[in-house]
């Protein structure tokens, strides 16, 4: 039976993950085994449960308990379900709950890149992409367009932040992902060394004098290719581009010279995922 608890005290510590903890506090880098992430909406929560993530607690609009989210409760065992009316929950969290439900999950242990990429042939590498909406959209494209893994550098947005998870529609739970290096100083040199040691050629998505078209036949023939995408404003750093085996451009019309990184990722995954 669901363990349903009516909210009577906004300051109760068990509500901290939903109301007061920052993203860094939720992540808990000092004690990663205690880290938490928040999933939002029944569909996203279902995908997290399907992937084996362990629920810690739920925050749910009262009418959802016997409504669209009832199926989720049956899958969450005795995890506490904190509930109130929609207006009260919005006051508590500071935002309108998508589909009236949030779930706090235990963060998974980080997986080594070497393990993630053991049998991978096409991976996405994200450098310094800090917009959670873009990160979520990139993961959704990576899942849909057959990327084997997504690798982030240490300055990238956490793929398990609430908005990235929501925008990805839970596909962040379906695509293996990991981090290249421990600190920003490890990128690009150490990160590129890891990719090379795993047999990957690297393709920087950037405009330069040596850029080849995304439909260049040599790219499709590469047995293992890492597609490197850069930050929203300035794109990839010059030393990252210089470290890559290829610099790749997307042919465009009407004088347009670039796309939003999430849109560019979808084009790149579609074209460069072909073998």
Residue ranges of predicted features:
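Boundary-proximal intrinsically disordered activation/regulatory segments immediately upstream
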Residues: 1-68, 156-157
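Short acidic-hydrophobic, aromatic-tinged amphipathic segments that line or gate anion-handling sites
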Residues: 4-11, 80-85, 176-187
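Active-site/ligand-binding-proximal alpha/beta "capping" segment
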Residues: 203-254
């Amino acid at each position: 039976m669901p363990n349903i608890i009516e909210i009577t005290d906004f300051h109760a510590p068990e509500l901290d993950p939903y109301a007061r903890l920052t993203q860094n506090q939720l992540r808990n880098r000092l004690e990663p085994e205690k880290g938490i992430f928040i999933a939002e909406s029944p569909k996203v929560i279902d995908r997290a449960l399907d992937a084996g993530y362990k629920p810690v607690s739920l925050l749910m609009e009262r009418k959802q308990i016997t409504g669209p989210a009832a199926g989720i409760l049956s899958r969450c065992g005795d995890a506490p379900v904190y509930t109130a009316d929609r207006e009260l929950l919005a006051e508590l969290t500071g935002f309108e709950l998508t589909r009236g439900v949030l779930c706090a999950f235990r963060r998974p242990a980080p997986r080594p890149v070497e393990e993630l990429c053991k049998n991978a042939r096409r991976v996405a590498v994200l450098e310094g992409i800090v917009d959670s909406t873009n990160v979520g959209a990139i993961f959704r494209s990576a899942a849909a367009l057959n990327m084997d893994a997504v690798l982030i550098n240490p300055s990238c947005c956490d793929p398990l932040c609430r908005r990235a998870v929501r925008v990805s529609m839970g596909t962040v739970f379906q695509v293996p992902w990991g981090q290249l290096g421990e600190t920003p100083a490890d990128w690009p040199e150490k990160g590129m060394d890891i990719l090379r040691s795993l047999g990957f050629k690297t393709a920087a998505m950037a405009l330069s004098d040596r850029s080849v078209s995304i439909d260049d036949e040599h790219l499709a023939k590469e047995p293992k290719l890492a597609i490197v995408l850069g930050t929203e404003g300035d794109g990839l750093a010059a030393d990252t581009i210089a470290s890559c085996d290829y610099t790749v451009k997307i042919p465009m019309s009407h004088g347009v010279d670039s796309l939003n990184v999430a849109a560019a990722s979808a084009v790149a995954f579609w074209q460069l995922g072909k073998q």
